A protein has these predicted regions:
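Non-catalytic, solvent-exposed segments at the cell envelope interface
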Residues: 1-394
Length: 394
């Protein structure tokens, strides 16, 4: 799942030759289908939204629950690309987050599930496939999501291999008996099963929670994006072909996303975007007082995040907002990335926001007439892809 965020760029480069290798496509709700058919992803009013899901049906694989039947969305990431193509925001939803799930019918079994007012978000895929997961996140955020994709664990392994591995920093040793992952402190190049184990590791990082795993995944994602945008990966046709084949042969796409014009358009929206404008955030949550294994939506902070996404505002994170299992790399200042737009604050360097009673804070205009970044509440953790961070083992 980690490498899917760059697949829009890489896969689109040879989409015409590779789309046939995708296992199959799925339909979303009627409204989402119509939007995907009629809209141009490069010029969608309010920006483009894509839901990316990671799942595997193999019971007992690594850190999964051994009594689980069927697929669950272990990873749920909403990608918002601004209409002006100046920022990408990837919002990770904890799998242990309790949310309302609408009534859904499983497309494979025909089983109907009634609407639930409080259910774990990772149950939505099993209730009604990709479409149900999309409807769940739409209801939660108030956004329209016309595009979606699901990748299996095998896809993560093959795509990391195609890239020749991803370099990650480990601040404290990781020793996870559940995934078998053992990493000493320092730099590591991860691919194949090691890359998958790193992305799946929960017990080996931070405080052992799913929230810690999300911040560790953001370390990997950011390192991956820096790699593919800095070493010529996207201009290497051999690597692109391998990456595209690995992605599409292990992905299920919504009908609207499984179109050559859509993937090529997606590539054009990301082309030239600075990694400082690629922002990873965790959907804001609070502990469930009745069950410490679960979390609930932080209503105030979530409202602010939802509003800025709905209004397609450029955003920034407060200082020192890395997650539960990440910290700034000691070598972070050795290869600084310049920002070509002085009016835009770096995604990870905004001031903390106290919020307002009426919704998200307003963004002031920059010196060149471009709106400056709206700072997100300090309770929202994450980082930009340009920030060099390390995963903290426990």
């Amino acid at each position: 799942m980690a490498v899917v965020l760059v697949s829009g760029t890489s896969v689109a480069a040879i989409a015409g030759a590779q789309l046939a290798s995708a296992p199959h496509t799925v339909e979303l709700s009627t409204d989402d289908q119509n939007t995907a058919k009629t809209a141009d992803i490069t010029a969608m009013q309010g920006g483009a939204n894509i839901l990316l899901l990671g799942s595997d049906t193999r019971v007992g694989q690594f850190d999964s629950d051994e009594n689980v039947e069927g697929a669950r969305n272990d990873v749920t990431i909403l990608v918002h690309i601004s209409q002006d193509h100046q920022q990408l925001t990837a919002v990770s939803f904890p799998r242990d987050l309790k949310v309302p799930i609408p009534a859904c019918t499983n497309p494979e079994t025909g089983t109907s599930y009634p609407a639930a007012s409080s259910e774990l978000i990772n149950e939505s895929l099993g209730h009604g496939g990709i479409s149900c997961a999309v409807d769940t996140v739409e209801n939660l955020t108030g956004l329209t999501i016309p595009y979606a994709g699901l990748i299996t664990f095998d896809g993560v392994i093959e795509m990391s291999n195609a890239l020749g591995g991803v370099d990650v920093c480990v601040a404290k040793p990781i020793d996870d008996s559940y995934t078998g992952l053992q990493l000493s402190a320092g730099q590591h190049t991860l691919e194949g099963q090691d890359a998958l184990a790193f992305l799946r590791s929960r017990h080996g990082v931070g405080d052992g929670s799913d929230l810690a795993r999300i911040s560790s995944q953001q370390v990997f994602l950011s390192a991956l994006l820096r790699k593919v945008t800095s070493d010529g990966t996207l201009s290497n046709p051999v690597t692109l072909y391998k990456l595209a084949g690995a992605a599409l042969s292990n992905m299920t796409l919504s009908d609207g996303l499984a179109q050559t014009r859509t993937l090529v358009g997606l590539a054009s929206t990301l082309r030239g975007m600075s990694t400082s404008d690629m922002l990873f955030v965790q959907y804001p949550v609070v502990d469930d007082p009745s069950d410490t294994a679960h979390v609930l939506v932080d209503e105030a902070a979530a409202h602010e995040l939802n509003v800025v996404l709905q209004q397609d505002r450029k955003t920034s994170l407060s200082d020192s907002t890395t997650g539960r299992a990440s910290e700034e790399s000691p070598t972070a200042g050795s290869t600084p990335e310049s920002d070509t737009s002085p009016s835009q604050a770096p995604a990870g360097g905004g001031a903390a926001s106290d919020g307002t009673a009426s919704g998200a804070p307003s963004a002031a205009a920059g010196s060149a007439g471009t709106p400056s970044a709206t700072p997100l509440p300090s309770s929202i953790s994450g980082q930009s892809a340009s920030e060099q961070t390390c995963t903290v083992g426990n």
